[in-house]
């Protein structure tokens, strides 16, 4: 088990494009760290630099206290699991898993014990004689994981390993990866663009955007306290609603609607209001504003109401849209006009220019009685 330290890591290409810019990160011994972000944010490039598959332009990469910038991949004691499995098609499952151990001249009896124990842990011990073409996608991924596990590396790297699996298999494999990582207690770095995958797997979540770190924290810390509009809208499904508002001498306004927030600690001007769908309450008489329901998605236990605001138009004179989560059996129909109230503990304000979170102590009037519990 090992620590991983990245100090001002930069990756630049000859054409001037900078995939990663002065990125610093500390990964503790036994920690599962998930790098999440949209395509092109630099997460896979960063993982490849850790593995030694990409050259680091500048900065320092240390495993424990050892600088590894110039070490070959084989010298770093790292195992990597890819999304395409990378299994040898002519070899059996057993031989695929044993391949690295044989190259390291591990005694035959030890190879047999290690492979059998790992296969049993992964629940693929009944597949050891099969070839990859005879396996399902989930089984192939478990073989790829087994091949990495038998090496007992200092660090595991996962590069979107579940991307090729269907939705049901992804859920199953997420659970298995999490259980395995806890059991093995091996330092792990996992790359994904799927924020649900990131939230469920991570001990520490690193949100990347355009080659830089937007925020680092536990999944709940990032969900409850996003540092920017980017993080707020990337983490969470459905995404956080972001509404344009203004701070005036009368208070916080959305168009011509005056909110019940005490804004004495805010500077006058434009501001962005962040509201998660599950933190919006439907009430008989709204202290905030009303919306019209334009679309309803039923998820069984919940309804997702896609709404447009009424009388909340901003400078461009267009309606603002937001999503509200309601109880699954609520009697709500398209075209209904609903009053909304906000759970003050979960209200977020962002600077209109920088999109960064504004830390203030919000004070509001009492919540109104809920119409739809």
Swiss-Prot record:
Its EC number is 7.6.2.10. It is found in: Cell inner membrane. Its main location: membrane. One of its GO terms (biological process) is carbohydrate transport. GO terms for cellular component: ATP-binding cassette (ABC) transporter complex, substrate-binding subunit-containing. Disulfide bonds: none annotated. It is an enzyme of class 7 (translocase). InterPro entries: AAA+_ATPase, ABC_transporter-like_ATP-bd, ABC_transporter-like_CS, ABC_transpr_MalK-like, ABC_transpr_MalK/UgpC-like, Mo/tungstate-bd_C_term_dom, NA-bd_OB-fold, OB_MalK-like. Residues 4-235 form the ABC transporter domain. Transmembrane segments: none annotated. Keywords: ATP-binding, Cell inner membrane, Cell membrane, Membrane, Nucleotide-binding, Sugar transport, Translocase, Transport. It catalyses: sn-glycerol 3-phosphate(out) + ATP + H2O = sn-glycerol 3-phosphate(in) + ADP + phosphate + H(+). ATP binds at residues 37-44. Part of the ABC transporter complex UgpBAEC involved in sn-glycerol-3-phosphate (G3P) import. Responsible for energy coupling to the transport system. The complex is composed of two ATP-binding proteins (UgpC), two transmembrane proteins (UgpA and UgpE) and a solute-binding protein (UgpB). Belongs to the ABC transporter superfamily. sn-glycerol-3-phosphate importer (TC 3.A.1.1.3) family. This is sn-glycerol-3-phosphate import ATP-binding protein UgpC. The lineage of its organism: Bacteria, Pseudomonadati, Pseudomonadota, Gammaproteobacteria, Alteromonadales.
């Amino acid at each position: 088990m090992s620590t991983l330290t990245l100090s001002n890591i930069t990756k630049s290409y000859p054409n001037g494009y900078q995939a990663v810019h002065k990125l610093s990160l500390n990964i503790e011994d036994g920690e599962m760290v998930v790098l999440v972000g949209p395509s092109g944010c630099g997460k896979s490039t960063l993982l490849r630099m850790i593995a030694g598959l990409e050259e680091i332009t500048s900065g320092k990469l240390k495993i424990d206290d050892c600088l590894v910038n110039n070490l070959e991949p084989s010298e770093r004691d790292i195992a990597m699991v890819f999304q395409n499995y990378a299994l040898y098609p002519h070899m059996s499952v057993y031989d695929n898993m044993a391949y690295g151990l044989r190259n390291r001249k591990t005694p035959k009896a030890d190879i047999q014990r290690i492979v059998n124990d790992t296969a049993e842990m992964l629940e693929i011990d009944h597949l050891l004689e099969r070839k990859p073409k005879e396996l399902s996608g989930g089984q192939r991924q478990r073989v790829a994981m087994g091949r990495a596990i038998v090496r007992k590396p200092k660090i595991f790297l996962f590069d979107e390993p579940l991307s090729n699996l269907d939705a049901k298999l992804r859920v199953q494999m997420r659970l298995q990866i999490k259980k395995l990582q806890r059991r093995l207690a091996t330092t792990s770095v996992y790359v994904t663009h799927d924020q649900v995958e990131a939230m469920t797997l991570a001990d520490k979540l690193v949100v990347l955007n355009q080659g830089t770190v937007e925020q680092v924290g536990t999944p709940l810390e990032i969900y409850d306290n996003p540092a920017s509009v980017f993080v707020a809208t990337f983490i969470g499904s459905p995404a956080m609603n972001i509404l344009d508002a203004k701070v005036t001498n009368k208070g916080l306004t959305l168009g011509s609607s005056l909110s019940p927030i005490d804004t004495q600690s805010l500077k006058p001007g434009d501001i962005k209001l962040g509201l998660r769908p599950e933190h919006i309450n439907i009430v008989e008489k709204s202290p905030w504003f009303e919306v019209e329901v334009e679309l309803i998605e039923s998820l069984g236990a919940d309804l997702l109401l896609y709404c447009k605001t009424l009388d909340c138009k901003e400078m461009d004179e267009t309606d603002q849209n937001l999503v509200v989560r309601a109880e699954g059996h609520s009697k709500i129909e398209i075209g209904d006009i609903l009053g909304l109230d906000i759970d003050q503990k979960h209200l977020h304000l962002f600077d209109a220019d920088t999109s960064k979170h504004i830390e203030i102590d919000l004070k509001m009037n009492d919540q109104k009685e809920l119409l739809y519990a």
